[in-house]
Amino acid sequence: MRTPRALIPLLAVAGAAAVVVTAGAGAAIENVSGTTGPALADAAEALPPATVNALTWNVCGDTGCPMGSRPGELATEIARQLAGSEVGGRTVSMNAVFLQEVCSGHVDTLKREQRLRSWSWAFAPSRTTGGAERACANGQGTLGVAVGTEAPMSDVREMRLPSPDRYGRSAACGTVGAWNARLCGVQLSSSQWDDDPRGQWRGKQIGALGELAAENRVIIGGDFTERPESPALDPLYRAFAECDQGPNESRTGAMTQQDWRGTPVAKTDYLFISKTAGASCGVSGTPTRASDHRPLAAAVSFR
């Protein structure tokens, strides 16, 4: 657990009733910042403070994962993490979530959870050769990334990222008017031999995400595959602050990826936020049995 810039009040933001919206498969864009950046930037001086309690988690929801064959249990565990995760030594209720390797069926189940029924959701599918949506092998719909917010979310988009044809990647993005913030969730190409073993596509994907720096308030959450010291992450560390980086902007942070024994082995999960925001961040020291990644939670204060 770290408090890299400022230990902020751990207050949940109460959201009004939200209309659930989901990104359509044809809603791809090349430049998110060109559509919403000016509207948020013009109001920069007048923006009220906002606190976003955000959690990012690669839930490993497909077949071959710890709970891949038990989707109902995985959805319950996600909801439990949202109800209370440790940040800055306190248990905090989350009002935003970024999920990776999640199936559309899991999101549908979460929408029926009592506490989450009023949340807004954005979903962006992973794709196979030719651009077809990648199906979850466990019958849970489409595999992809999702963003959920307690407050209403608008301008929901699927942001297609440069990717190898066999494993198409996208970011799911939406704007929360109550926070005057743009949120994007992503999972970059993996280092598998048949995906992006040399990292050339991840570099291009990170470059595309860097365009979001034009926004006044931004949170980008997800599994970036790379470790903090990787040069591939240089553009993001220059443009944003990472919630768990150490003093003097050192690129550190608690490890989020764990091996089959539950031992943490690397930090590959991140919450990049606007540098004007303050944040407190936390990763559980207890192994999770639901995934090969531990959730990363943060309280972000936009001032």
Q: Where do the PLM segments sit?
A:
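Active-site-proximal beta-strand elements of phosphoester/diester hydrolases
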Residues: 51-65, 157-159, 180-192
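Active-site beta-strand/loop signature of hydrolases that rely on acidic residues for catalysis
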Residues: 53-59, 78-110, 148, 174, ...
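Alpha-helical scaffold elements lining the catalytic groove of polysaccharide deacetylases
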Residues: 69-76, 196-211
